[in-house]
Design a protein with these regions (language model features):
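Short acidic, Gly/Ser-rich segments with clustered Asp/Glu that frequently serve as metal-coordination loops
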Residues: 113-115
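Nucleotide/phosphate-binding catalytic cleft detector across ATP-hydrolyzing
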Residues: 1-111, 120-195
């Protein structure tokens, strides 16, 4: 399994299956797994489109080293004929339909899984950017730690991610009641399920 399908398996795999995260803090942590993941994504996107390997664009944190940049490019070349790298803040701004080519400053904050990117863009380029390796993964870890300390409750990474998305969204769900939120986990002392 790869991508969302594999993410759903985290913490739930039997002993003979190993779930790995090929990326950590926005960079490749397991090259072979990253290469395999990219190949699978390309195959899924390329189904029924012929045999010619595609050209791909990969977003990377703006603060990566040249070695990390080269590793991403090489992993991408495992399934593509051409790889273009784009700084994640630029990709996020384009995806958000911000005026990145206009002669004005546009600020973007992109909180990913492994890095948070803050950048000012203008005239199609990056004027100023900062990348910190603190992001969604650390928020998940903080939720797990808080529930353990404050409520003697153990929850998994997937539950922490669901909590983060539900109560920490930049675009709140108007139907969601923020005054209370039920969480299911295991009681730390008894080991029994609790809410």
């Amino acid at each position: 399994a790869v991508g969302e399908e594999a993410k759903l398996m985290l913490g739930r795999t039997p002993g003979n299956i190993r779930a790995v995260r090929p990326l950590r803090d926005g960079v490749i942590a397991d090259f072979d797994a990253a290469e395999s993941m990219i190949k699978t994504f390309i195959q899924k996107c390329n189904e029924g489109r012929g045999i010619l390997a595609p050209r791909i664009v990969i977003g990377i944190p703006s603060g990566v080293t040249s070695v990390e940049r080269r590793a991403v490019r090489e992993a991408g070349l495992a399934g593509a004929r051409e790889v273009h790298l784009i700084d994640e803040p630029v990709a996020a701004a384009i995806g958000a339909s911000l005026p990145v080519t206009d002669p004005i400053g546009t600020m973007i904050v992109d909180i990913g899984g492994g890095t948070t990117e803050v950048a000012v863009l203008s005239l199609g380029g990056t004027v100023l950017s900062e990348s910190v390796r603190i992001a969604g993964d650390e928020i998940n870890e903080s939720i797990v730690a808080y529930l353990k300390k404050a409520h003697n409750m153990v929850v998994g990474e997937r539950t922490a991610e669901e909590i983060k998305i539900k109560i920490g969204s930049a675009f709140p769900d108007n139907d969601f009641d923020m005054t209370s939120y039920e969480v299911r986990g295991l009681h730390l002392l008894s080991g029994l399920p609790r809410s």
